[in-house]
Every structure is written in structure tokens, then in C-alpha cells.
Design a protein with these regions (language model features):
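Terminal leader/tail segments of proteins
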Residues: 1-72
Length: 72
């Protein structure tokens, strides 16, 4: 597992399955290898939405928050 700080309160973790974007301490989007970008279907805040868009997952498929939680 590799941890990469991207910006203030924005971190990426890479596992064997995916690259996962954390906004603050919450996984909010992921690039799942072989599937593509996904993002949470839960609204957290304007800042978290900005993090998702900046990371490139704006057009990703919305998935339940539990799916992102289970990637870590």
C-alpha cells in the first residue's frame, strides 16, 4: 500500500485493487483497475466535491459509500 499526499486534506492510497482518493479522512472516489473511476453517491461538502473533480473522477460512476469504504 502506498500513501501519496496530493493537496491540503487530499490524499491518495494505492492498493493492489485500486487508487483511492481520501478527502480529509474519508474515501470519496477511486480508480478501480480494470473498471475505471467511481465516486461516492453521498454528498459530503463543496470542498470534497472539488477534491473529487480535481482528481479526475467527476464523470465517474456513482457507487454507495460502503463500496469505497470496503476498498481500504
Amino acid at each position: 500500500m502506498q500513501l501519496t499526499p496530493i493537496a491540503s486534506n487530499m490524499t491518495e492510497i494505492e492498493t493492489s485493487e485500486a487508487r483511492i482518493l481520501f478527502s480529509y479522512r474519508t474515501p470519496v472516489a477511486a480508480y478501480i483497475f480494470g473498471e475505471g473511476y467511481v465516486k461516492t453517491d453521498q454528498f459530503w461538502s463543496v470542498t470534497t466535491s472539488r477534491h473529487i473533480n480535481k482528481w479526475g473522477a467527476r464523470d465517474g460512476q456513482e457507487v454507495p459509500q460502503a463500496r469505497l469504504d470496503n476498498l481500504v
